Amino acid sequence: MKKLFTNYNFEFNKNEKKILKTFCSQNLKQIQNENKYFAEIKIFSSLVEKLNSSEEVIKLTKDERNRLKLQLQENVNYLKKKMAKSWFLKKLLYKSMLTQYENILSNHFEG
């Protein structure tokens, strides 16, 4: 049976907050000047504000949660492709980012 209500409250630790904050800020910088990404700009700026707050529990909307999950999954796929093509040193750098993103996805967005 499908759940009727989904909980969009998240408790990120300090490191996860920092990673997500930089991730959202980078996304904002990339799409900042394009009018066709108005909805995404609104979502990611809201996410940055919520991650900057000192609250323990962060309440996301359904759109924010879905967009963040989608972007993290896309980033994981991109990093896996880049790692397959890169040399040892780059793989080493990408591996830490990849594991951090995968941990966030598995801990907070799966199930």
Residue ranges and their predicted role:
Residues 1-111:
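Positively charged, low-complexity terminal tracts
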